């Protein structure tokens, strides 16, 4: 019999979604919404990020909160749709990064948290 707990999950279903918010209150509101709807298992909010980018031909610099959201492939589109519909930015940062490896216990918790 195989010991599932000791096995590596070779291709985790987990993904990390990156999103910036203009301030901590907005980031906390967005995080609370996606957590309540079980679209993300965890939201890490990192205040103090500085973003530089061109918008409509002008160099912009904004102080933002970087949101790191942990979810699964099967929840990623609903998470992106939710963030986009409740985000104050016209074009929010919404990037999905694949998770190629992770601790089995953490990945199991992540999956269970979204059920």
Swiss-Prot record:
Its cofactor is Cu cation. It comes from the Bacteria. Transmembrane segments: none annotated. The keyword Transmembrane does not apply. Keywords: Copper, Cytoplasm, Metal-binding. Gene3D superfamilies: 3.30.70.120. Binds 1 copper ion per subunit. It is found in: Cytoplasm. The keyword Metal-binding applies. HAMAP family: CutA. Homotrimer. Involved in resistance toward heavy metals. Belongs to the CutA family. This is Divalent-cation tolerance protein CutA. The lineage of its organism: Bacteria, Pseudomonadati, Pseudomonadota, Gammaproteobacteria, Enterobacterales.
């Amino acid at each position: 019999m195989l010991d599932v707990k000791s096995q590596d999950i070779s291709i985790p279903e987990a993904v990390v979604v990156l999103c910036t918010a203009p301030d901590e209150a907005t980031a906390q509101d967005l995080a609370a919404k996606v957590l309540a709807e079980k679209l993300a298992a965890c939201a890490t909010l990192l205040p103090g990020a500085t973003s530089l980018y061109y918008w409509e031909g002008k160099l912009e610099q904004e102080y933002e909160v970087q949101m790191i959201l942990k979810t699964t492939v099967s929840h990623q589109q609903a998470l992106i749709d939710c963030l986009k519909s409740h985000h104050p930015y016209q074009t929010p940062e919404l990037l999905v990064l694949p998770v190629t490896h992770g601790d089995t216990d953490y990945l199991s918790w992540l999956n269970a948290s979204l059920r």
